């Protein structure tokens, strides 16, 4: 009953734009389903999405003596 008194926050699934209630029980939030979550993950893996900013080069690490070969 307490939930009915509160305003339920709804967001749109970033993948399919379906309305999703934002609540702890929704394991896929902000997505509506596991499928939409995996589609988004695939987009990141394919380079479809990026985070803007400067690229930093990583320091070179030399192999220690007796390295795995």
UniProtKB/Swiss-Prot annotation:
The entry lists its GO molecular-function terms as: DNA topoisomerase type II (double strand cut, ATP-hydrolyzing) inhibitor activity; zinc ion binding
Query: Would you identify the family this protein belongs to, as annotated?
Result: Belongs to the DNA gyrase inhibitor YacG family.
Recite the UniProt keywords alphabetically. Answer: Metal-binding, Zinc
What is this protein's gene name? yacG
The molecule here is called DNA gyrase inhibitor YacG
Q: What is the lineage of its organism?
A: Bacteria, Pseudomonadati, Pseudomonadota, Betaproteobacteria, Neisseriales
Cite the SUPFAM superfamilies for this sequence: Glucocorticoid receptor-like (DNA-binding domain)
Q: What does this protein do?
A: Inhibits all the catalytic activities of DNA gyrase by preventing its interaction with DNA. Acts by binding directly to the C-terminal domain of GyrB, which probably disrupts DNA binding by the gyrase.
Q: Which organism is it from?
A: Neisseria gonorrhoeae (strain ATCC 700825 / FA 1090)
InterPro entries reported for this sequence: DNA_gyrase_inhibitor_YacG (IPR005584), Znf_NHR/GATA (IPR013088)
Q: Which domain of life is it from?
A: Bacteria
Q: For this chain's UniProt record, which GO biological process terms are given? A: regulation of DNA-templated transcription
Give binding positions for Zn(2+): 13, 16, 32, 36
Q: Which Gene3D superfamilies does this UniProt record tie to the protein? A: Erythroid Transcription Factor GATA-1, subunit A
| Disulfide pairings | none
């Amino acid at each position: 009953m307490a939930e009915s008194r509160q305003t339920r926050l709804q967001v749109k699934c970033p993948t399919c734009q379906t309305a999703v209630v934002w609540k702890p029980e929704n394991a896929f939030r902000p997505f509506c389903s596991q499928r939409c979550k995996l589609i988004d993950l695939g987009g990141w893996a394919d380079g479809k999405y990026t985070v803007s900013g400067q690229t930093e080069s990583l320091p070179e690490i030399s192999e220690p003596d007796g390295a795995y070969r």
